[in-house]
């Protein structure tokens, strides 16, 4: 499991800021150092940018270009390099001897060889097209659940009042999310404060639940 995964939905009780994101990553780094593990990976969803205010992005210290409406053009920059630059600055300020490298994960993930699940899922969707066509269904997208049941999905069911498709957000109250954020990640808790003091003066500033106001 990855020591830290950061998605915008986890900030359901506080604002998304660069400071909180950096502290969450450092929280995982500190926990790994306490455990004697000298490596790790933090995944940060690029979606966090869409939940930040323009002021937060502008005050990050990163030089962005802006569109005609004054919004930062996020598509022109590498999000991984932005976070890594800010993270390295923070690590140096704390005096931590930790190196980090940015990796932008993009379309190459979609270009790997298909696995058994991919082959099965695509086959089900293909059969689903024929099934719904035979039933006279049109103007819909074919979907299949984990049981293989095929159903049509109409645009009107997923668009808002302005005709835009509503993004599907992670349900933080769902069992999968609870399992990941409660049991799979590694971060500072009150039980780690004493051990973490050898690396930072205020370990409570990196307490996972305090950062998210959980």
Task: Please provide the spans of the model-predicted regions.
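C-terminal non-catalytic interaction/assembly regions of soluble proteins
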Residues: 57-214
């Amino acid at each position: 499991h990855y020591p830290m995964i950061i998605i915008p939905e986890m900030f359901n009780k506080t604002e998304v800021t660069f400071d909180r994101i950096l502290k969450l990553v450092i929280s995982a780094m500190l926990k790994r150092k306490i455990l004697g593990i000298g490596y790790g990976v933090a995944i940060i969803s690029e979606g966090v940018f869409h939940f930040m205010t323009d002021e937060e992005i502008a005050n990050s210290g990163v030089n962005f270009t802006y569109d005609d409406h004054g919004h930062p053009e996020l598509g022109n920059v590498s999000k991984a390099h932005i976070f890594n630059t800010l993270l390295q600055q923070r690590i140096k300020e704390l005096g931590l001897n930790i190196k980090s490298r940015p990796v932008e994960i993009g379309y190459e993930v979609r270009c790997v060889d298909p696995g058994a699940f991919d082959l099965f899922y695509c086959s089900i969707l293909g059969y689903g097209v024929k099934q719904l066509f035979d039933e006279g269904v049109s103007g819909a997208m074919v979907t299949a659940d984990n049981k293989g049941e095929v159903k049509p999905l109409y645009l009107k069911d997923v668009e808002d009042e302005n005709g835009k498709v509503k993004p599907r957000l992670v349900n933080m109250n769902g069992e999968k999310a609870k399992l990941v954020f409660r049991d799979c990640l590694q971060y500072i808790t009150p039980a780690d404060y004493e051990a973490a003091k050898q690396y930072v003066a205020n370990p409570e500033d990196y307490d996972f639940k305090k950062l998210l106001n959980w």
